[in-house]
C-alpha cells in the first residue's frame, strides 16, 4: 500500500512550477517509476519514499535546468513514538517564514530549518522539536504536523502559520471530521 502516492506526486508537480523549473516532470511518470522501484525491491515492510526533481549540473544559482529526477525507497520502521508517544521541545530555532521561502511546496531546502531544530532537540534529550513562527505561534515540527485536542476540539496551526500544507495534515483533518466528529480550529 502506497499512502496517497498520486496526491504526493501532484504536489511535486505543483512544486516544480513554483520553483520555476524549465521542464516539469510529469506526475504519472514519477508514479510509474516509484511503483516499479518498490516492486523491483520486493519491499514487505514500512518504507520511506523520496521522489526528487532538481536542477542538475553546474548551473548558476538562478539556473532553471537541466532538470533531473531521483527516487529513493528505503526501509523505515515505524518510530517508537507512534506507540509510546514522544517528548518534544519548543525549539529556539524559529520556523522560516513563508514570505522568505515557499513553504507550501515540497522542496529539499525547506528541510534544513527543521533539521537544525531536531538536532538541537536530540542534543537536549528530546525526541522531537516544535517550531514557532516569527510571531511566537506554533507552526509545525521537523517533518511533522502539530495537532492537539483541547476540550473536545481539534486544534492545529492554520495554513498561514508557515507550514507545509501536507497530505498527512489534510488526511488527519478529513478523518477527524468524518469519523471522530471533531471540527478543527
Residue ranges: model-predicted function:
Residues 46-53:
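ATP-grasp fold ATP-binding core
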Residues 1-36, 40, 54, 60-185:
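Helix-start/capping segments and mature chain N-termini
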Amino acid at each position: 500500500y502506497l499512502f496517497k502516492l498520486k496526491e504526493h506526486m501532484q504536489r511535486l508537480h505543483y512544486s516544480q512550477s513554483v520553483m520555476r523549473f524549465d521542464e516539469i516532470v510529469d506526475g504519472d511518470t514519477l508514479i510509474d517509476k516509484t511503483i516499479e522501484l518498490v516492486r523491483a525491491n520486493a519491499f514487505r515492510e514500512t518504507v520511506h519514499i523520496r521522489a526528487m526533481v532538481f536542477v542538475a549540473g553546474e548551473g548558476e544559482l538562478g539556473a532553471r535546468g537541466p532538470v533531473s529526477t531521483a527516487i529513493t525507497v528505503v526501509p523505515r520502521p515505524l518510530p517508537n513514538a507512534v506507540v509510546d508517544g514522544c517528548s518534544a521541545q519548543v525549539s529556539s530555532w524559529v520556523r522560516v517564514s513563508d514570505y522568505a521561502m515557499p513553504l507550501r511546496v515540497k522542496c529539499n531546502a525547506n528541510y534544513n530549518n527543521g533539521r537544525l531544530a531536531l538536532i538541537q532537540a536530540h542534543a537536549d534529550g528530546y525526541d522531537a522539536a516544535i517550531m514557532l513562527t516569527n510571531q511566537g505561534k506554533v507552526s509545525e515540527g521537523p517533518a511533522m504536523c502539530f495537532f492537539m485536542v483541547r476540550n473536545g476540539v481539534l486544534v492545529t496551526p492554520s495554513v498561514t502559520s508557515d507550514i507545509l500544507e501536507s497530505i498527512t495534515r489534510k488526511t488527519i483533518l478529513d478523518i477527524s471530521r468524518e469519523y471522530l466528529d471533531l471540527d478543527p480550529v
